[in-house]
């Protein structure tokens, strides 16, 4: 056989090999057909109506509606097509109906349905459309804004239901599938994989989200996320996007969280969560060095609320929480949802680092208050006594009134910031310094003494109160 013939023969064999690989790879892809056929009947479309003031502005004789209440796909269309004008004053006397669209799924034959809180929030009427196109009015049993879970009930019997799975067993890289009503297109199916678990999102402290690359769009909210066994492992809730559409970052509420919330809503119409009564922050590399940790990990306690569970259990400012009941705290965001999942009254074991030493505290978890916002502010005028130091700040003693308002025994208030380390780390007049280099500050004189003894070329921590919120910051003093 000639050389050209050998080359052609080898090329043909290689092509056959590639085709075989492609066929084998295709054969390994999951077939979602049985799953979709079995699960779809239990997935529902949810539409809501809400009466809102009708604000209408004039646009050259053309009546331009207020677009805020329209479903997202219609609102985006009109925003592109009709320029919005300022609302006409006094136009709120009349009312109109605002509508929204979402998804949900049936969890019991007698009509209990799970969806997102943001799908049904403030609705005057909730309509559930089943897979056979029949519609039922739903009653809102309860909502939980902190987890974005809502429980509905329709009056019906022998409804199709989903199979509930254990989201704790979900693995990163596992195939998952969503069924919902994106932009109102009922029972649309999309698939992808689990990208990560235990994700924390801004202002969503109590849910360890499942991150996927499943295509999720407006209208998918509240719909189920299935594993390959046809079990619901999450409720599709949010996407991260810069364009308003899907960008490969979707987030679902784990069913372990959703069902705990649903059970409480069904039993009492409200949700109780565990609460420590602390303000925490992330431990970065510099803070880890400052507090003598081997690596950045845990939740740094920046503030302990007076008479709260943590205070009663002996937790102190500057403690670093490493684990709760044996579960490691890798990032500070891990702590809130672990504590929140505990029943109030539970005695939890907290492993902490305090002044370089490890110890375990037993803390009785309290009940999260309805409003866990900031408790103290600092707006009183500082006293006239001053003390300057090598950090580039002038400080003053706190008055007794300030200490009482801020629940402090010591500390100093910044009067002036000059050029130097303080300016570089963003300190401002009015900030209150309570700790420096892991030492509590008792007076302006004490602050100056501690500042003068600070080490050079090593991370140093400082605890600062600004408008009632405490945090640790770090800096280094050069030679």
Swiss-Prot record:
Keywords, comma-separated and alphabetical: Hydrolase, Periplasm, Protease, Repeat, Serine protease, Signal, Stress response
Entry's family note: Belongs to the peptidase S1C family.
Primary enzyme class: hydrolase
UniProt EC number: 3.4.21.107
Annotated function: Might be efficient in the degradation of transiently denatured and unfolded proteins which accumulate in the periplasm following stress conditions.
Protein name: Probable periplasmic serine endoprotease DegP-like
Amino-acid positions noted as binding substrate in the UniProt annotation, renumbered to this chain: 219-221, 276-280
Record InterPro entries: PDZ (IPR001478), PDZ_sf (IPR036034), Pept_S1C_Do (IPR011782), Peptidase_S1_PA (IPR009003), Peptidase_S1C (IPR001940)
Residues making up the signal peptide according to the UniProt record: 1-27
Start and end residues of each PDZ domain: 265-356, 362-468
Active-site residues (renumbered): 118, 148, 221
Pfam families: PDZ_2, Trypsin_2
Disulfide bonds: none
Any one GO CC term of the record: periplasmic space
PANTHER family noted in UniProt: PERIPLASMIC SERINE ENDOPROTEASE DEGP-LIKE-RELATED, SERINE PROTEASE FAMILY S1C HTRA-RELATED
Main location as per UniProt: periplasm
Single annotated GO MF: serine-type endopeptidase activity
Catalytic activity line of the entry: Acts on substrates that are at least partially unfolded. The cleavage site P1 residue is normally between a pair of hydrophobic residues, such as Val-|-Val
Region (Disordered): 368-390
Compartment(s) where it occurs, according to its Swiss-Prot or TrEMBL record: Periplasm
Biological process (GO), any one: proteolysis
